[in-house]
Amino acid sequence: MHVTFPRLPDHEAGYSVVERDDGVVYQLLGGRAGTALPHDIMHLVVERELGITDGIWGGIAAGMVFGSMRHVRGRRPPHVTERSALLKRTYRDRILRAELLGNLVETIAALDDPSADEIRRLTGAKLSVLRMPEPPSPQAFAAAARALQVEAARWARLRPGGELRYEWALPVTHHVPRPRARR
């Protein structure tokens, strides 16, 4: 899946263009344009760096369509709305986990050289609502935070009219459960 983030003039409504592997293209609406890293890039980078295949971007690759997405071109699969709703219900907890992990890594990225103990403390505080058997290590979180800092710097240097393009190459792990047989 290819995802392109155009750098628009400040204060315009931002968006990205999502080209899924099935040929369907969506426009994903985001927040206001500016020099701050868009929220959707943050999630893409964090999920990619932590290998999260069942989060927001893995869900989009698998066929989830969020309310902030507009179909641009390409033949949508049959029953796309029902399939998307089922995927969102089935993977709701994993999407929440991806949101919280993104927030955690964004917080770590804002710190000046955080220690492993500081990352562990933040992890405990920010992920306390999750049931995660084993969260990523402080080293993995620190590496994801560094990648996020690099992307934030790239975005801040980008002038209106430029764009950042990403490849989502992680495997699709979201699967639609089979409906129960009716008797």
Residue ranges and their predicted role:
Residues V46:
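Short active-site segment of divalent metal-dependent hydrolases/proteases
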Residues M1-R7, H11, V18, V25-L28, ...:
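Metalloprotease/metallohydrolase-associated module, dominated by Zn2+-dependent proteases
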